Design a protein with these regions (language model features):
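N-terminal glycine-rich, Lys/His-bearing helix-loop that initiates the first secondary-structure elements
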Residues: 1-78, 196
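Short, conserved alpha-helical segments within structured domains
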Residues: 37, 68, 95-96, 274, ...
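Conserved PLP-enzyme active-site core in the AAT-like
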Residues: 71, 75-311
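Conserved glycine-rich beta-strand-loop-beta hairpin in the small C-terminal domain of fold type I
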Residues: 300-301, 317-321
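Short, well-structured beta-strand/strand-turn elements
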Residues: 313-315
């Protein structure tokens, strides 16, 4: 009798999983958007929470059977707020892109203008133009303007940005939102230097902390929400060592707009098992985050210097990497 093709495929999947695990056990991945969660986080991820649905907000669910899910989600929000010194946290977004979309949906309309870093300047595709298939433009219909950028210093030009915003206002293209953060940046963005200016034009400021969330949590980078950002979005699995997922932070005034944007706007049920994993990761970051973030930066600088010494051109040399 010929072997079942279904059985062959089934076995192949587990063979490939074993090969993958063996490969990565003997590798040092250098992909900035990846990290390894702790055994405790992984235990939460494989819990029965992954089989359940929980639309809505703790205490106000569409589904029954959410007693313990609600307890964990409330704890998760408490930990997120404590970790980032925020008054409000929505832990339901299933990715950093969905977190960004929640802010777009809450604080702008299709056709509004957002100013953001361009992709060559380190911006993320979720901040991008429609013609580049960027999430902000393609999905939410935002018109995107880019910050003037000093490539040599790897920084947004503050004076030129102020001038550009004034010119955009004259041309009836005043931004509704300003996005800081990105997917390739080594140094803090000038939130503090620009926030007062932007707020004189009633521009909502969001900081996409996806790649630096763990460094911010550990107090080793900038502190965007103390520097003037209204909201902060992130994924939870890069320098923050959690599961794949997203997070939106803000103050009390942002609670209702963000909650409505997340549900029912962008998600029905969220990934509840990953939410539990986020809670564990937030607790771990509160306990170990400062030392972890310091070691991440130390490792990166030493590695950059070593690469530079053997002839690689490494970004950020003039600023100490």
């Amino acid at each position: 009798m010929a072997k079942s093709q279904n059985k062959e495929s089934y076995n192949k999947i587990f063979t490939k999983l074993k090969e993958h695990h063996k490969w990565f056990e003997n590798s040092i991945p250098l992909i900035a958007s990846e990290n390894i969660p702790s055994p405790a986080v992984r235990e939460a991820i494989i819990s029965d929470f992954g089989n359940r649905y929980a639309e809505g907000w703790p205490g106000d669910r569409v589904y029954a059977g959410c007693i313990y899910i609600d307890d964990v989600e409330v704890e998760c929000m408490k930990l997120a707020k404590k970790l980032y010194k925020a008054k409000f946290a929505d832990v339901r977004p299933i990715s950093g892109v969905v977190a960004n979309l929640a802010v777009y949906s809450a604080y702008s309309n299709p056709g509004d203008v957002m100013i953001a870093p361009s992709i060559p300047a380190g911006g993320h595709i979720s901040h991008g133009k429609r013609e580049h298939s960027g999430t902000a433009g393609l999905v939410h219909g935002l018109e995107i303007e880019f910050y003037p950028f000093n490539a040599e210093d790897m920084t947004i030009d503050v004076d030129k940005t102020k001038q550009k915003v004034k010119e955009l206002k004259k041309n009836n293209r005043l931004p509704k939102m300003a996005m800081f953060g990105g997917s390739l940046f080594l140094f803090p963005h000038p939130v503090k230097e620009l926030s007062d200016f932007l707020k004189t034009y009633d521009i909502h400021i969001n900081y996409d902390a996806a790649h630096v969330a763990g460094l911010i949590a550990g107090g080793k980078f900038q502190d965007p929400m103390r520097e003037g950002a209204d909201t902060m979005t992130m994924s939870t699995h890069k320098t923050l060592f959690g599961p794949q997922g997203g997070l939106v932070l803000g103050s009390e005034e942002h609670e209702e707009p963000i909650k409505k944007a997340t549900f029912p706007g962008l998600t029905s049920s969220h990934h509840i098992n990953n939410m539990a994993g986020k809670a564990v990761a937030f607790a771990e970051a509160l306990e170990f985050g400062k030392d972890y973030a310091a070691q991440v930066i130390k490792n990166a600088k030493i590695f950059a210097e070593a690469l530079n010494d053997v002839g690689f051109k490494v970004l950020g040399e003039s600023r100490g990497y």
